[in-house]
Design a protein with these regions (language model features):
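Helix-helix packing/entry segments at the starts of transmembrane helices
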Residues: 22-27, 74-100, 185-186
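Short, solvent-exposed interaction modules
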Residues: 60-76, 215
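Extracytoplasmic gate region of multi-pass secondary transporters
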Residues: 159, 163-171, 175
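Hydrophobic transmembrane alpha-helices of multi-pass small-molecule transport proteins
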Residues: 115-136
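C-terminal transmembrane-helix exit sites in multi-pass transporters
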Residues: 91, 97-117
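Membrane-interface interhelical linkers
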Residues: 1, 5, 9-15, 21-25, ...
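Residue positions within transmembrane alpha-helices of multi-pass solute transporters
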Residues: 5, 9, 37, 70, ...
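Hydrophobic/aromatic residues within the transmembrane alpha-helices of Major Facilitator Superfamily
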Residues: 1-5, 33, 66, 93, ...
Length: 215
């Protein structure tokens, strides 16, 4: 329930920032601050030099945050083109299919689970639902008519791969650091830094307009 609300709010914010990257930066920065406060209250020991000196830095410290950037920014690009409902459905479909692949093959250190007929039937129902939603969608919510909607559906499906991979990576980091809240903080911090750099490169401004721009 919260995902489409978050996406809609961030999409609205991007109309004032004039940049999807900038809107995502603000979203990640707020999340980072909240997680930092939680870590200070619940696990202050994870923020000490002694704790960091005992850790082994690897891809789990970086990749999770970058995948979060891809997913959040991707949703901001998709929402004005597909609408909230179809954006959520197509990305969730990608999440479920990637989640099934990770479980079936035990990728990224995940516990391997066998593929069942029920999972297959569920995926078929999801794809059928997307087809019906696209079929009855006679009036596009945007003016991007030059690009076929199938293209954006495919992009949304691929963007949906990011969250289950990110969750698996962050889970591994949480096991190594013995703190899921700290793992989330690292993920958000990396995402915030990456988005801030992208904002400076592509937007070249940190101004927020008082009037919004219709996407």
């Amino acid at each position: 329930m919260l995902l489409p609300i978050q996406t809609s709010i961030n999409s609205r914010l991007s109309q004032f920032t004039r940049s999807s990257f900038y809107a995502s930066t603000i979203s990640f920065a707020v999340g980072t601050i909240c997680l930092l406060v939680l870590n200070i209250i619940i696990h202050p020991q994870v923020l000490t030099p002694e704790f960091f000196s005992k850790q082994t830095l690897n891809y789990t410290w970086v990749l999770g945050g970058l995948l979060g950037v891809i997913y959040l920014t991707g949703n901001l690009l998709l929402l004005p083109r597909l609408g909230a409902a179809l954006t959520v459905v197509i990305t969730v479909t990608g999440q479920i299919i990637m989640g099934v692949i990770i479980d079936t093959f035990g990728l990224l250190g995940a516990h391997q689970q066998s593929f069942t007929i029920f999972k297959g039937v569920g995926i078929i129902f999801l794809i059928t639902g997307i087809i019906f939603m696209n079929y009855v969608r006679r009036h596009p919510v945007n003016r991007h008519k030059n690009t076929p909607i199938v293209f954006w559906l495919l992009i949304g499906f691929v963007f949906g791969f990011a969250p289950p991979i990110q969750t698996t990576i962050n889970s591994t980091l949480a096991q190594h650091t013995h703190s899921s809240i700290f793992a989330s903080l690292i993920s958000f911090s990396v995402g915030t830094i990456a988005l801030f750099i992208l904002t400076l490169v592509f937007n070249r401004s940190l101004k927020i307009s008082s009037t919004h721009k219709t996407l």
